[in-house]
Amino acid sequence: MKLQKLAGSVLLASLALGMVAPQALAAGEELVGKGTVTFLEDKTITTPTDPEEPGKEVVVDPGEGTTQTEQGPLSVDFVSVLKFGERTLTPSANAGVYEAKPTTVKKDGVDTERGNFVQVTDKRTGAAKLGWKLSAAMTKKFTSATTQDEIAAATISFANPFLNSTQADKGDIHADATVLLESDGSSAPVANAAAGKGWGTYTVEYGTSTDANMDKSVVLTVPASTPLSVDEEYTADITWTIANLD
């Protein structure tokens, strides 16, 4: 009986508390303010960042890389110049295999070597986040500036990709393990982001300073018996393209 009485007392106390009416405010004691915000499109050009320290800006000399000069919501921001150097021609039945030197960037004013890399940015938002695909093509064969001789069947291969970003979804972005560029100008896939992914800035570096493979990850191959001019610099065009994911 005591237990029933105690339970009843608790119930009555709860009901009593629930019946307390809020205190009415006097005139002038309350005022509702507003908060507003407007988001604008970022129309700045994204500058190169350190592929091994995302978000850290670096300075790259023109001889080391090509930097974007036009703004767009979906952009290729930077690509390394592939420097295969001066090579001595020797008679051989084997193809010539030449590795590209690393890219030198200035980080905090200090020359620092990084693997050759490409940087892209997607600033699209909302329904416009359609995903993207990055590709590359040798759109001009290696050609001598003086004689206009072409290396007809040379290839460039990329290996050991390291994809990096400050974005949390960087693990969802795919970078192809190997990329092979043929002299016929055909396009090769490099990386891609699914719809709803890939917002922000991403780098793909080929070889890293910690893995000691920066000077082994981008390779030019020239078929044996290819006629070549000595004391001539050959230059090729590598076009990197970012587009909506199909």
Q: Where does each model-flagged region fall?
A:
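Signature of Gram-negative chaperone-usher
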Residues: K2-Q4, V10, M19-D246
